[in-house]
Amino acid sequence: MGLPWYRVHTVVLNDPGRLLAVHIMHTALVAGWAGSMALYELAVFDPSDPVLDPMWRQGMFVIPFMTRLGITNSWGGWSITGGTITNPGIWSYEGVAGAHIVFSGLCFLAAIWHWVYWDLEIFCDERTGKPSLDLPKIFGIHLFLSGVACFGFGAFHVTGLYGPGIWVSDPYGLTGKVQSVNPAWGVEGFDPFVPGGIASHHIAAGTLGILAGLFHLSVRPPQRLYKGLRMGNIETVLSSSIAAVFFAAFVVAGTMWYGSATTPIELFGPTRYQWDQGYFQQEIYRRVGVSLAENKSLSEAWSKIPEKLAFYDYIGNNPAKGGLFRAGSMDNGDGIAVGWLGHPIFRDKEGRELFVRRMPTFFETFPVVLVDGDGIVRADVPFRRAESKYSVEQVGVTVEFYGGELNGVSYSDPATVKKYARRAQLGEIFELDRATLKSDGVFRSSPRGWFTFGHASFALLFFFGHIWHGARTLFRDVFAGIDPDLDAQVEFGAFQKLGDPTTRRQVV
């Protein structure tokens, strides 16, 4: 056809058979990527430490999505929760990956078949013999089938009626496991952190989709609406499909970045807002307070804090700390976490407990400032020693660790105290192994950050695509220069603009 490179899809504009073929091939590519990526991730994934080296620290992207849908076991004999298993069954991580690759191969063959056998009777209008599609009818079929799938997922898979359930955890990401979920039909179902809403909304949306699909299969659109929305034009389908996709992409970018029941922190890592609000820090202090009220010592109280909870309260796990273009997993940044050193408590020579002011998310460097319980600055690490009044040396700051590997150890040496004060800016203090992966010490984002950035970017791109193709289909006559009300026979090529006698071409 001699089309320019940016007109590639014009080839299948009036060719339903090959339009179907390219869509099947696209599905083959997507499924093939998903299966291949899953196998690659399984090849490099280390399941040995689900607490300090979980999937999100290792940069896993597709494993969390399989896990939240109920896959927890591997044919390698390990479970995502840390145990060993003997009978993982067919629907293991590898089983799901293999199913995607087999499906991809079948789609590949189907795409070739439909490309070769494009001229099928089903695509022809029996009245004219020309290729045409009954788009409103196809819309009804797709709506009905997607409604059935949506309803089935909510009513069977999520509820565990016929399926594994989904990943459910507590608000602090400590007790997560795959379990069946009962639909939440009350107002609590609208809370984005209530898993029951996932079941109820899929059941409700699926029911609506089934009814709407049956409606569109049994009722023809009015002629004015059909013409007004250009329902006979395949580009209308493209435009509205892009709208559905970009809307979904914006929604999931939000649920991922701000957090929801669909994006558990055990699978995707904590959100930046949990660091900003001191979410885990508050829970840790609450637990310590409860232990102290039971007449336990500081050492016993801090030793009861789960290492998993302490690890969430570390700025290196904040997805907003990694630059968008810093490639690699979190482990490639600050290293592989080996162990919790314990909670440092600083005191001045008068015995006051001091708290290190924590680094805000968007700072790379931050002054080391220690305040007392009333928020009054009592010590710091000065930029200019000559004018310092609150230096660690002058104030006589000491540090003692409670819980963790350094439990009961105290330091009064100013250099050591300052070292731990700097590290306390970043939350709880962990020993990090940078040698194994040659980690460079520069923070990386988690899959939560990548997913959000990718989906927000493509949603914006697809939004413009929707506007573009919507305008093309609504104003097709204007762009083509053909008056839709033109009923006279017009000779193509006689005029510079079709049907406009004022632009008659000059005969050479």
Curated annotation (Swiss-Prot):
Q: Where in the cell is it found?
A: Plastid, Chloroplast thylakoid membrane
Q: GO CC terms for this protein?
A: chloroplast thylakoid membrane; photosystem II
| Endpoints of the signal sequence | none
Please provide the record's keywords in A-Z order: Chlorophyll, Chloroplast, Chromophore, Membrane, Photosynthesis, Photosystem II, Plastid, Thylakoid, Transmembrane, Transmembrane helix
Predominant cellular place of this UniProt entry's protein: plastid
Q: Which residues cross the membrane?
A: 21-36, 101-115, 140-156, 203-218, 237-252, 457-472
GO biological process terms on file: photosynthetic electron transport in photosystem II
Is Aminoacyl-tRNA synthetase there in the keyword field?
no
Q: Which InterPro entries does the entry link to?
A: PS_antenna-like, PS_II_antenna-like_sf, PSII_PsbB
Q: Which GO terms describe its molecular function?
A: chlorophyll binding; electron transporter, transferring electrons within the cyclic electron transport pathway of photosynthesis activity
Q: How is the cofactor bound?
A: Binds multiple chlorophylls. PSII binds additional chlorophylls, carotenoids and specific lipids.
How does the record say this protein sits in the membrane?
Multi-pass membrane protein
UniProt record similarity statement: Belongs to the PsbB/PsbC family. PsbB subfamily.
Function statement:
One of the components of the core complex of photosystem II (PSII). It binds chlorophyll and helps catalyze the primary light-induced photochemical processes of PSII. PSII is a light-driven water:plastoquinone oxidoreductase, using light energy to abstract electrons from H(2)O, generating O(2) and a proton gradient subsequently used for ATP formation.
What does the annotation say about its assembly with partners?
Answer: PSII is composed of 1 copy each of membrane proteins PsbA, PsbB, PsbC, PsbD, PsbE, PsbF, PsbH, PsbI, PsbJ, PsbK, PsbL, PsbM, PsbT, PsbX, PsbY, PsbZ, Psb30/Ycf12, at least 3 peripheral proteins of the oxygen-evolving complex and a large number of cofactors. It forms dimeric complexes.
Q: What is this protein called?
A: Photosystem II CP47 reaction center protein
